[in-house]
């Protein structure tokens, strides 16, 4: 709050720096130009606009950051002072003519009020010397005190001083024959220029109705003229030697004996009847002075009345012009239809459309001209707010990027259609397609020469898209059933956007083809066949990618695109190339075409997968063989990961293919996990046996020191343990090799189905960075390696997870053990503490005695808390 207040003070009362030089503050100046003063965030009827150009704005910043004690004319406090003076001017506008005509000498309370008002204007004279002014040549605020003083002194200072000096200061010096009081009162009318400026600002202020501002201004001008006419004419009568030869005597012979109020009302009556030219009760001049004044008064009235009538006529015509134009348009359309003998239904459509357009414009529903005049960013924001949700649910745009969807919404035009109006005609050129926002339309086909309704489109449906995307005449006539709001998208604008988003264009085309396939209409089936033929021949206007052709298995289209110079290694938004897709789909001809045109057989996608692995996991042996013959390999840094994936899917054939194509399945991934580790975790004896036959090492530890043999013992896989023993009969204990960390207890943490965690980003293959959800393994997250992989995540995060068991994402359970005082007792489940001393204290609280020994279920003594695992049974004994 303090900062904001200080910013405002910088704008209005800026600080002065060394030598009187103002510090340059371009950012602050620009901010204050747009937000401070009396300028709101959305109104620029008041305030100072910056000049064009960045350099010009910088050069003018010193004029925006005003000097010390110089007030901006746009300061809201100064504007409030100005409004206060306008109210005082309204009083002056009445009092000055009244004192001139009806008073000869000062009389309370008017004289007191006059002096109070004069005091305020005297303060304003002093204040004006400290108010910056706008240079009309450069439109910059001038804050030099000398220039401000010179400008004011050489222009309006003398008038302001004369109109402010009280009459009492020098009235006694004037001769008795001079009506000094009234003359000096009239000098105060100089202040009326403030009212004119006030109304000029109000007319530009959108918060106030322009019609009523103009009417108020004209009314005040009329009242002021009538008031002045009455006062001037009465002054002539009051100073005429013979009171009986004046216009006042026509109504009352002894009019000078009447009260001041009666005389003022009488004079106002004659003045206003003369001003309004009613023809009865006009001021009748009985002497030469009155006749001369009335002559000029009535001539002036003629001009003023012409001005008032012209203004009022213009205001009324402006209000009714829209209705008049509507009626003229309806009349012209009806005359045209009748003159050319148009069908009655077509005439009704014309009139209904024009009537609806008038309603939408008059009710503010569709101000297209105003919207088109706005900047593109504002237009886009309006369209996004109103229509994004509807367009997002349209089948044609399912799966496209948010960027393209936003751009499409920005290009759409909202239109209203009355009931029974044709939106699209059969066989017309496909220039636009439409999305339903509200309402409903009938889709009409011509069957045996008769129009029949074959379908209906409602909110969120699209029509006309087949003609636009396939570039063929529209198939159906679309006619509204009731008042409907539609979004129209021009074909040219649509194609221009899709050209810059080739991948999204393929998605849109797939959505259309799937829609045609799902349709039961025979006509749509025929269109599907024609469209697919056009795709194969490359005759579609939509930009199609190699990935689109590969996904469809369309080798003809793929060949056409490659002949046109498409990059065989181009990728989609997931980093997958056409070769990845063709290999996974089993499209052998597509694979051949891509390899012939130079596609890289070892290119990786964003997940690190290569085409050969896609062919292997998809069981496309011919593609795998073809890729291998053309140089495709499973690289050393990823083969261990692929092997683990195959084991996780219990896919023995994939492991065999890895071996077949030169992969070493005994290698480990970045966590040191081998395929044998994974096979033991899955409990798959067949795969374990196969891996052992291919040279897998059962005693090779991972980064935690766990070997496959130790895992089999821990998980209780008796058949696997027997296989290991028969393969290599050694003592069943975990072997720590040099350089490996000490074995950590098992910890259960949430994990992705694949082991993607790593020590360093450089050491990790791309495939381990992001694993596709389509390859999730159902069993791994509950396996030992799933637990350990998640534990690795915890260690890398810097927090100790030795006793942590995660649940889902972010939830951590502590490791738990069962303690008992007797071997046969069921015991109590407690949280595993960090030391044996704490465990003994817990035993004292739970069991009621202080234990001196801690034994395992098998009777072995435990002397280190680190060898206790989650779920162990502990026997606490007190030995004397």
UniProtKB/Swiss-Prot annotation:
SUPFAM superfamilies given in the database record: Ankyrin repeat, cAMP-binding domain-like, Voltage-gated potassium channels
GO cellular component, one term: monoatomic ion channel complex
Annotated residues for binding of a nucleoside 3',5'-cyclic phosphate: 396-517
Regions of this protein lying in the Extracellular compartment: 104-111, 175-182, 239-265, 286-291
Tissue expression per record: Predominantly expressed in flowers.
Transmembrane segments: 83-103, 112-132, 154-174, 183-203, 218-238, 292-312
Intramembrane region coordinates: 266-285
Localization terms from the record: Membrane
Keywords from the named record: ANK repeat, Ion channel, Ion transport, Membrane, Potassium, Potassium channel, Potassium transport, Repeat, Transmembrane, Transmembrane helix, Transport, Voltage-gated channel
Keyword Cell membrane: no
Cytoplasmic side: 1-82, 133-153, 204-217, 313-880
One Gene Ontology term of the molecular function aspect: voltage-gated potassium channel activity
CDD domains documented for this protein: CAP_ED
Major subcellular site: membrane
Membrane protein topology class: Multi-pass membrane protein
ANK repeat coordinates: 541-570, 574-603, 607-636, 637-667, 671-700
Keyword check for Lipid biosynthesis: no
KHA domain segment(s): 809-880
Family: Belongs to the potassium channel family. Plant (TC 1.A.1.4) subfamily.
Subunit-level organization: The potassium channel is probably composed of a homo- or heterotetrameric complex of pore-forming subunits.
Protein role: Probable potassium channel. May interact with the cytoskeleton or with regulatory proteins.
Entry text on domains: The segment S4 is probably the voltage-sensor and is characterized by a series of positively charged amino acids. The pore-forming region H5 is enclosed by the transmembrane segments S5 and S6 in the Shaker-type (1P/6TM) and contains the GYGD signature motif which seems to be involved in potassium selectivity. The KHA domain (rich in hydrophobic and acidic residues) present in the C-terminal part is likely to be important for tetramerization.
Protein name: Probable potassium channel AKT5
Native species: Arabidopsis thaliana (Mouse-ear cress)
């Amino acid at each position: 709050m303090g900062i904001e207040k200080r910013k405002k003070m910088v704008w209005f009362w800026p600080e002065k720096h060394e030598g009187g030089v103002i510090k340059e503050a371009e950012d602050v100046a620009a901010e204050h130009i747009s937000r401070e003063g009396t300028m709101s965030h959305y109104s620029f009827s008041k305030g100072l606009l910056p000049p064009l150009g960045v350099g010009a704005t910088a050069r003018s910043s010193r004029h925006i950051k005003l000097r010390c004690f110089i007030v901006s004319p746009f300061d809201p406090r100064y504007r409030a002072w100005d409004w206060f003076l306008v109210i005082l001017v309204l009083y002056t506008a009445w009092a000055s003519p009244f004192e001139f005509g009806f008073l000869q000498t000062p009389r309370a309370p008017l004289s007191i009020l006059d002096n109070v008002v004069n005091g305020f204007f005297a303060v304003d004279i002093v204040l004006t010397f400290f108010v910056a002014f706008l240079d009309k040549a450069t439109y910059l605020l001038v804050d030099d005190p000398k220039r401000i003083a010179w400008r004011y002194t050489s222009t309006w200072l003398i008038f302001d001083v004369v109109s402010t000096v009280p009459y009492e200061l020098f009235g006694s010096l004037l001769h008795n024959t001079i009506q000094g009081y009234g003359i000096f009162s009239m000098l105060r009318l100089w202040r009326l220029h403030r009212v004119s400026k006030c109304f000029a600002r109000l007319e530009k202020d959108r918060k106030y109705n322009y019609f009523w501002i103009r009417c108020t201004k004209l009314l005040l001008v009329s009242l002021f003229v009538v008031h002045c006419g009455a006062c001037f004419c009465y002054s002539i009568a009051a100073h005429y030697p013979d009171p009986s030869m004046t216009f006042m005597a026509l109504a009352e012979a002894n009019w000078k004996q009447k009260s001041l109020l009666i005389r003022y009302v009488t004079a106002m009556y004659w003045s206003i009847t003369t001003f309004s030219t009613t023809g009865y009760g006009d001021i009748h001049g009985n002497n030469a002075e009155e006749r001369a004044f009335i002559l000029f008064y009535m001539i002036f009235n003629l001009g003023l009345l012409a001005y008032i009538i012209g203004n009022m006529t213009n205001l009324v015509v402006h209000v009714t012009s829209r209705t008049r134009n509507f009626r003229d348009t309806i009349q012209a359309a009806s005359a045209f239809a009748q003159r050319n003998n148009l069908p009655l239904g077509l005439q009704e459509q014309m009139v209904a459309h024009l009537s609806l357009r008038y309603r939408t414009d008059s009710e503010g529903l569709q101000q297209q001209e105003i919207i088109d005049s706005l900047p593109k960013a504002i237009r886009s924001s309006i369209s996004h707010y109103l229509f994004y949700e509807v367009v997002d649910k349209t089948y044609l745009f399912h799966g496209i990027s948010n960027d393209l969807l936003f751009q499409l919404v920005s290009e759409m035009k909202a239109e209203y259609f009355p009931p029974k109006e044709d939106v699209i005609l059969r066989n017309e050129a496909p220039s636009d397609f439409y999305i339903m926002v509200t309402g409903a339309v009938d889709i009409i086909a011509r069957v045996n020469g008769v129009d029949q309704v074959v379908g209906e489109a409602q909110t969120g449906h699209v029509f006309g898209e087949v003609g636009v995307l396939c570039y063929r005449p529209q198939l159906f006539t679309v006619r509204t059933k009731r008042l409907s709001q539609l979004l129209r998208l021009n074909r040219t604008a649509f194609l221009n956007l899709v050209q810059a988003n080739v991948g999204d264009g393929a998605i849109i085309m797939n959505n259309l083809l799937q829609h045609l396939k799902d349709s039961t209409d025979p006509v749509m089936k025929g269109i599907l066949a024609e469209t697919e033929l056009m795709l194969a021949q490359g005759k579609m206007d939509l930009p199609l990618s190699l990935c689109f052709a590969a996904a469809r298995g369309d080798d003809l289209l793929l060949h056409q695109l490659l002949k046109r110079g498409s990059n065989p290694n181009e990728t989609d938004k997931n980093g997958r190339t056409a070769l990845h897709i063709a290999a996974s789909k089993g499209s052998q001809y597509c694979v051949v075409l891509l390899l012939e045109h130079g596609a890289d057989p070892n290119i990786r996608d964003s997940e690190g997968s290569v085409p050969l692995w896609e062919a292997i996991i998809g069981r496309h042996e011919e593609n795998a063989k073809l890729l291998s013959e053309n140089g495709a390999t499973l690289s050393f840094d990823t083969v261990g990961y692929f092997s683990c994936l195959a084991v996780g899917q219990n896919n023995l054939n994939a492991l065999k293919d890895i071996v077949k194509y030169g992969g070493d399945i005994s290698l480990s991934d970045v966590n040191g996990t081998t395929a044998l580790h994974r096979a033991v975790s899955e409990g798959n004896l067949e795969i374990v046996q196969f891996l052992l036959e291919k040279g897998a090492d059962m005693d090779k530890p991972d980064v935690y020191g766990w070997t496959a043999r130790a895992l089999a013992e821990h998980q209780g896989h008796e058949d696997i343990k027997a296989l290991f023993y028969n393969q290599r009969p050694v003592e069943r204990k975990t072997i720590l090799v040099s350089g490996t960390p000490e074995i950590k207890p098992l910890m259960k943490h949430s994990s992705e189905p694949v082991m993607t965690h790593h020590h360093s980003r450089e050491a990790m293959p791309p495939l381990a960075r992001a694993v596709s959800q389509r390859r999730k393994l159902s069993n791994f997250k509950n396996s030992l390696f799933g637990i350990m992989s998640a534990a690795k995540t915890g260690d890398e995060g810097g927090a100790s997870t030795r006793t942590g068991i995660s649940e889902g994402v972010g939830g951590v359970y502590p490791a738990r053990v069962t303690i008992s005082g007797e071997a046969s007792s069921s015991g109590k489940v407690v949280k595993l503490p960090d030391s044996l001393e704490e465990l003994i204290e817990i035993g004292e609280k739970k069991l009621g005695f202080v234990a001196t020994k801690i034994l395992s279920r098998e009777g072995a003594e435990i002397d280190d808390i680190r060898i206790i695992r989650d779920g162990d049974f502990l026997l606490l004994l007190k030995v004397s």
